[in-house]
Each structure stands twice: as C-alpha cells, then as structure tokens.
C-alpha cells in the first residue's frame, strides 16, 4: 500500500501556523534588489522579503526571475487520466485482482497502472482504503486545450481537478476503457465518478538560485510521474536548503544548495524522459 497525497499534505500543513499560511493572494511576478526580494500580487499589493523560495510548481512565476528568461514547461505529448476511489466502489471481481497489488497493463502508446493507498484520513484497514489508478494516453498538443476544458468551458493550462471534467468527456473515457483495457481496469475507470486529468510536462532549470531567489521542487525540475520521485525530489530540495540556511549566510547557503541539488534534478529528469519514451 502506498501513502496518499492528502495524507502528506495534512501532516505538513499541521506544522504551519494559520497566520503563516495565506490563501487567495496569488503572486503575479517576482523581482529583487541587492537589499530585498519583492512579490507583486494579483490584487495589486506587494510583499518584501529577505529570501523568496519558489515552490510554485509546473507553472512557476518565480522561475523566470531566477533564470532571467521565459522558462515555460514543455508538453511531453501525453496525459495522465486519474482516479481515486474507495476500494469498496470496485466491483468484487475487479477488487480481487487489483487490491493489494501494483497492477500494470501496457498497450501501444498507452499504459495504465493502479495501487491501493490509505483512506481519506490515513486509514489502513481493509475496506477503508482507496484505489488509485493512472492511465497514460497520448494526446496531440492541438487537442490538449479541448481535453483540458472544464464544465464551465474554461481551458486550463495543466490539469483538471475532480469535478471539473464534463460528464460527456467522462463517458467517452469510460467507453474507451471498455474497449481498450482489461475488464478489471475498465471497471475501475467506470467506478470513478469524478476522474481528473494531468497533462505531462518537462522542464529543467539551468540554475536553481539567483540573488535572493531560489527554486524548489517542480518549479526547478518538472519530472515525469513514472519516476515516482516528485515528492522525494522536492523533499530533498527542501532539506538541502534548510540545512544550508541553518549553518551558512544566505548567499553561501544558496550556492551550496544549487551545487548539491542541480545535478540531482538533471539526473531525475533524464531518467523520467527515458521511462516516458517507453510509453507503449
């Protein structure tokens, strides 16, 4: 059984004070002087800081301020359809084959995998857990906007969350699963009432720090999910940055951080592309 994202989130979120975790104030851009870094927010306000750590993911707004140039993530040519459902929602025959196994099926230009994860509150007891499936499928860049259009007709740049997928698109997904997948996996796809979708992107930063700015996690390296190292990579970045800041002046700490983590990010990103090239 694997741990789930929401379990990790709650564990770390509990360590942060309410006043230190601010929602609803999106950052538009980042800049800096010799004395401070500045955040320009979408609401027109500004915040000043000694150091800004951009842990803002695939669409990072901190990234261009670090690299000094436009630095978009590059679409890799395929998407991951995903489902996360109570194990009790699986038909009995499918559950007997899929639960407590890392199941995998490959076909031309596509593959699907699935595994059991903890329940919504970290439950590990049989019957209280969830089943997570991921179905990789090739989608042309020209079709991507249509696939990432939500129920309100808005086009999203990277993903659709649970509940955002139009029912008509879900029905097509279920029908495709019935035609293309083994019955246990097809049943798992059909059992998910709110599938979600993640487009797969690549990005490698040429640098992780600049002045009073640093990149961390997917803001620095967007790696393919096949590596199963996205969380571990970000955690490694965070621990390395913390270690440096705890013992060195910030400028020296950032240099040490980049020296340690940049080659690791390059290696993981390369490994992910190798795995993705085997799709199908």
Residue ranges and their predicted role:
Residues 46, 127, 206-209:
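Short, flexible hinge/linker loops that cap or flank conserved catalytic cores
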Residues 36-37, 66-70, 96, 148, ...:
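Short, glycine/charged-enriched secondary-structure capping and boundary segments
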Residues 4, 90-188:
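Conserved FAD/dinucleotide-binding core of flavoprotein oxidoreductases
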Residues 60, 80, 111-113, 220-221:
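Histidine-centered metal-chelating micro-motifs
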Residues 23, 35, 108-110, 193-196:
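Short beta-strand or tight-loop elements
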Residues 53-54, 81, 133, 168-172, ...:
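Conserved mid-domain beta->alpha element of the FAD-binding
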Residues 1-86:
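Conserved N-terminal helical subregion
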């Amino acid at each position: 059984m694997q741990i789930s994202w929401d379990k990790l989130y709650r564990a770390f979120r509990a360590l942060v004070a309410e006043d230190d975790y601010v929602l609803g104030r999106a950052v538009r851009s980042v800049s800096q002087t010799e004395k401070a870094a500045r955040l320009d927010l979408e609401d027109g306000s500004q915040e000043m800081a000694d150091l800004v750590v951009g842990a803002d993911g695939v669409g990072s707004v901190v990234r261009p301020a670090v690299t000094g140039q436009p630095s978009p993530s590059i679409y890799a040519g395929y998407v991951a359809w995903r489902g996360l459902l109570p194990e009790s929602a699986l038909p009995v025959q499918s559950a007997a084959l899929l639960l407590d196994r890392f199941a995998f099926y490959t076909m031309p230009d596509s593959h699907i995998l699935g595994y059991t994860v903890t329940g919504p509150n970290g439950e590990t007891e049989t019957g209280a857990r969830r089943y997570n499936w991921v179905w990789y499928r090739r989608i042309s860049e020209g079709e991507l906007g249509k696939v990432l259009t939500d129920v309100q007709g808005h086009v999203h740049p990277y993903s659709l969350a649970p509940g955002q997928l139009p029912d008509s698109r879900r029905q097509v997904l279920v029908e495709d699963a019935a035609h293309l997948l083994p019955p246990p996996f097809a049943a798992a796809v059909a059992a998910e009432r709110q599938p979600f979708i993640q487009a797969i992107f690549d990005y490698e930063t040429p640098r992780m720090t600049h002045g009073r700015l640093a990149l961390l996690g997917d803001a620095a390296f967007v790696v393919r999910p096949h590596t199963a190292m996205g969380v571990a990579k970000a955690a490694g970045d965070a621990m390395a940055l913390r270690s440096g800041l705890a013992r060195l002046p910030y400028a020296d700490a950032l240099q040490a951080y980049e020296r340690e983590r940049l080659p690791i990010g390059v290696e993981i990103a390369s490994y992910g592309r190798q795995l993705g090239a085997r799709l199908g």
